[in-house]
Swiss-Prot record:
This is L-lactate dehydrogenase. Catalyzes the conversion of lactate to pyruvate. Allosterically activated by fructose 1,6-bisphosphate (FBP). The gene is ldh. Disulfide bonds: none annotated. The active site is at residue 188. Homotetramer. The modification Phosphotyrosine is found at residue 233. It is found in: Cytoplasm. It comes from Corynebacterium jeikeium (strain K411). Keywords: Allosteric enzyme, Cytoplasm, NAD, Oxidoreductase, Phosphoprotein. Beta-D-fructose 1,6-bisphosphate binds at residues 166, 181.
Length: 326
């Protein structure tokens, strides 16, 4: 597939109107967080199940009086994309028990081609936020199908994996997760990796803290990461889907965009030479502001981390090639 022809780069549509496409568990968790935090003045929800969507819209509107915000929630159509500041895509085939995120490629790429085409044909000029799996590949597909500048297409990437890892490390060190600064990068999936070499806990490097604990600490952290990586499978087995963690992560990205925060978050974005790769969406820290992705932040990886990142990127490249995206 040839590279997309970007639109002339103009400022994204102002305001805070959001069109949410896909009212499943993830989409509605995101919608509830938007209403609760007052991150949008108008949320339009599009889903194939119009009756259920109507029910969600009524339920969310009934939460507004206690939110201290004046959010309007409506059943949306693609016409709503014309003046939307953001379109968040949570639609697509869901991950089933025992199914990997990469197993969803063919089904969801076809779905996305239709969705993104409908969004763009209605004059959308905002920022895409992609949450459907496999998110790195579908973020790349959204960039290709839309013709948008890559800064306008943000994937949720490893924002949830990083949250899970920080939470677990916080429990291990008996500290609040907000005192843990460590990233999970790479594919949002089985080949992701933690970057311990650049991580810190309460201002001290993670490696130093582990040395203070003793020999068993490295094995403990390895086990923590494995549980982080495989958490989705266990949660899906238990309750059918993951929703609250990713809903909050999507809201955090939305806040960073609409508040022009220039904050570093672990998302999926296009690499343009970082880590030695180009033309691939993958999880990495990046600076987020009102224009979307200002730039990716390349972490300094040790040799083992670099080898694992290269493997993750090459796995994604192989699947993208098989799907006809590159």
């Amino acid at each position: 597939m040839t590279a997309p022809q970007p639109h002339t780069i103009t400022p994204p549509t102002p305001g805070s109107k959001i069109v949410l496409i896909g009212a499943g568990d993830v989409g509605i968790a995101y919608a509830y967080t938007l209403v609760n935090q007052g991150l949008t003045d108008h949320l339009a929800i599009i889903d194939l199940d119009e009756r259920k969507t109507w029910g969600h819209v009524q339920d969310l509107n009934h939460a507004v009086p206690w939110s201290h915000h004046n959010t309007r929630v409506t059943v949306g159509t693609y016409e709503d994309c014309r003046d939307a500041a953001m379109v968040c895509i949570c639609a697509g085939a869901a991950q089933k028990p025992g199914e990997t995120r990469l197993d969803l490629v063919a089904k969801n790429t076809a779905i996305f081609k239709t969705i993104v085409g409908d969004v763009m044909s209605h004059g959308f000029n905002g920022i895409f936020l992609v949450a459907s799996n496999p998110v790195d590949i579908l973020s790349y597909a959204t960039w290709k199908f839309s013709g948008m500048d890559s800064s306008r297409v943000i994937g949720s990437g490893t924002i949830l994996d990083t949250a899970r890892f920080r939470y677990a490390l916080g429990r291990y060190f008996d500290l609040a997760p907000t005192s843990v600064h460590a990233y999970v990068i790479g594919e949002h999936g089985d080949t992701e990796l933690p970057v311990l070499s650049a991580g810190s806990v309460a201002g001290t490097s993670i490696h130093h803290r582990l040395e203070m604990i003793g020999e068993s600490a490295d094995e403990d952290v390895d086990e923590i990461f494995v549980k982080t990586r495989d958490a989705a499978y266990e949660i899906i087995q238990a309750k059918g889907s993951t929703s609250f963690g990713i809903g909050m992560g999507l809201a955090r990205i939305t806040q960073a965009v609409f508040s022009n925060q220039d904050v570093v978050l672990p998302i999926s974005t296009l690499l343009q030479g970082e880590y030695g790769f180009e033309d691939i969406y993958i999880g990495t820290p990046a600076v987020i502001n009102r224009q979307g992705v200002r730039h990716a932040v390349e972490l300094q990886l040790d040799s083992e981390e670099k080898e694992r990142f290269d493997h993750s990127a090459n796995v994604l490249r192989k699947v993208m090639g098989e799907a006809g995206l590159i």
